[in-house]
Amino acid sequence: MATVKFKYKGEEKQVDISKIKKVWRVGKMISFTYDEGGGKTGRGAVSEKDAPKELLQMLEKQKK
């Protein structure tokens, strides 16, 4: 499965696409929430040009 690499609060993070719950666009950035485990929800964002195609496909599916 694909992963998304991003920085959040100065920390490099990586999350598996399968853990992503919600995806939305903010300007040229793709923002998302994901399951961190233990009942916690994490947030992240990646530029549109750096986003993996699977994340962009999730965004298109949610628009419909």
From Swiss-Prot:
A GO term for molecular function: RNA endonuclease activity
UniProt xrefs under Gene3D superfamilies: 2.40.50.40
Pfam families noted in UniProt: 7kD_DNA_binding (PF02294)
Group of enzyme by EC: hydrolase
Record EC number: 3.1.27.-
Signal peptide as annotated in the record: none
Modified residues (N6-methyllysine): K5, K7
Modified how: Lys-5 and Lys-7 were found to be 60% monomethylated.
InterPro entries xref list: Chromo-like_dom_sf, DNA-bd_7a-e_arc
Keywords: ADP-ribosylation, DNA-binding, Endonuclease, Hydrolase, Methylation, Nuclease
Quaternary structure, from the entry: Homodimer.
NCBIfam families (UniProt xref): Sul7d
Reported function: Can constrain negative DNA supercoils. May be involved in maintaining the integrity of the genome at high temperature. Has RNA endonuclease activity with a narrow substrate specificity; the cleavage products are 3'-phosphooligonucleotides.
Family from the record: Belongs to the 7 kDa DNA-binding/endoribonuclease P2 family.
Name of this chain's protein: DNA-binding protein 7a
Biological classification of the source: Archaea, Thermoproteota, Thermoprotei, Sulfolobales, Sulfolobaceae
